């Protein structure tokens, strides 16, 4: 089977109004893909920017897939959360990006968004924290129901990804 190696890191995030940020991430693939090594999801540490608005995570990603075809190419889905001084966490943004399909190193910028909710939920978020969240995480990367959401823009997550493709020509898989 053809193989894909995804090696890189979640560098950090900019543009979020919240302070102490961390990122939950996961990778979604189609049925023809098999994870040979690595973990399918993870979480960064909390970083509070001291100067500027860049939260640095430098969280490693190292995945090795085998595939029979291109359908269901890997997508990286992200959830950025903020943590207050009491340890309470609230959603700062959702985002996703496709893993590039060409070999080499790539710098990706993944914009994020969060659901707004009703005016009461927005008011409660401003004073108490929390706020609306998605019931199903697959809504992040499937556009079927996403068009009905009222959202607010979040910040941007920065990723550095290196991609290695192996045996694509041997198994007749064309990129």
Swiss-Prot record:
Coiled coil: none annotated. GO terms for cellular component: centrosome; ciliary basal body; ciliary transition zone; cytoplasm; membrane; MKS complex; nucleus. Transmembrane segments: none annotated. The keyword Zinc does not apply. Residues 2-118 form the C2 B9-type domain. Pfam families: B9-C2. Keywords: Cell projection, Cilium, Cilium biogenesis/degradation, Cytoplasm, Cytoskeleton, Nucleus. InterPro entries: C2_B9-type_dom (IPR010796). It is found in: Cytoplasm, Cytoskeleton, Cilium basal body; Cytoplasm, Cytoskeleton, Cilium axoneme; Nucleus. PROSITE patterns: C2_B9 (PS51381). One of its GO terms (molecular function) is gamma-tubulin binding. Its main location: cytoplasm. It comes from the Eukaryota. GO terms for biological process: cilium assembly. Component of the tectonic-like complex, a complex localized at the transition zone of primary cilia and acting as a barrier that prevents diffusion of transmembrane proteins between the cilia and plasma membranes. Belongs to the B9D family. Part of the tectonic-like complex (also named B9 complex). Interacts with TUBG1. This is B9 domain-containing protein 2. It comes from Rattus norvegicus.
């Amino acid at each position: 089977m053809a193989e894909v190696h995804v090696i890189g890191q979640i560098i950090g995030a900019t543009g979020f109004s919240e302070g102490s940020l961390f990122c939950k991430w996961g990778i979604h693939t189609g049925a023809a893909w098999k994870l040979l090594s690595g973990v399918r999801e993870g979480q960064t540490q909390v970083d509070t920017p001291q100067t500027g608005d860049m939260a640095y995570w430098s969280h490693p990603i190292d995945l090795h897939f085998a595939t029979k075809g291109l359908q269901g190419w890997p997508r990286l889905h992200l959830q950025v959360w903020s943590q207050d001084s009491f340890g309470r966490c609230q959603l700062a943004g959702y985002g996703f990006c496709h893993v590039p399909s060409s070999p080499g190193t790539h710098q990706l910028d993944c914009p994020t968004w969060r659901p707004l909710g009703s005016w009461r939920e927005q008011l409660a978020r401003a004073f108490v924290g929390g706020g609306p969240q998605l019931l199903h995480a697959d809504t992040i990367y499937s556009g079927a129901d996403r068009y009905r959401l009222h959202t607010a823009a979040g910040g941007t997550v920065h990723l550095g990804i290196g991609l290695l493709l192996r045996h694509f020509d041997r198994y007749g898989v064309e990129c």
